[in-house]
């Protein structure tokens, strides 16, 4: 029934704002990529900024809030010794106003199945962990097949909120 009172009334004004972001990424490899093995060394270095113009956040009401600029950087490296296994250390950092996040971790990756005579699919198993500064420890596992992956991650609270959460993520 379109005449039922629902209590949700909004001015149907169109609101838009301009937001400027920019970033760049550099990828390197010690050798040409190959479907059957990990590169001996490779990595990615990235950095980006969001909300460069530090505009106003538009809401359904007339209230507006300043948006702080966000800086993000990440470093990902892959080191494969026997080329059937690799260690991938990584770091992620983000800064917005006075809030920050710094997370560092690593994953061990193993080839389970390489391409065979008639296909170029590969299966990779990964297990790893990370630590987010003053906040949480993380564990994760992942299985990749061809261009698909499925994984599970869990966080254990290490911050001052540990008492309330009993350490669970």
Q: For each of these PLM feature ranges, what is it?
A:
Residues 61-80, 85-169:
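Outer membrane beta-barrel transmembrane domains
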């Amino acid at each position: 029934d379109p005449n039922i009172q629902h209590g949700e009334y909004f001015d149907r004004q169109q609101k838009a704002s301009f937001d400027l972001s920019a970033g760049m990424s550099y990828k390197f490899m010690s050798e040409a990529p190959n479907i059957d093995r990990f590169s001996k060394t490779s990595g990615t270095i990235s950095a980006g900024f969001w909300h460069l113009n530090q505009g106003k956040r538009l809401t359904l009401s007339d209230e507006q809030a300043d948006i702080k600029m966000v800086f993000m950087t990440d470093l990902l490296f892959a080191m494969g010794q026997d080329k059937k296994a690799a260690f991938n250390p990584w770091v992620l950092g983000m800064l917005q106003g006075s809030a920050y996040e710094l997370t560092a971790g690593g994953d061990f990756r193993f080839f389970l199945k390489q391409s065979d005579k008639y296909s170029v699919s590969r299966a990779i198993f990964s297990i790893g962990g990370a630590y987010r500064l003053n906040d949480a420890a993380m564990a994760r596992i992942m299985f990749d097949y061809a261009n698909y992956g499925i994984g599970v991650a869990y966080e254990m609270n290490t911050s001052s909120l540990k008492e309330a959460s009993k350490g669970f993520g």
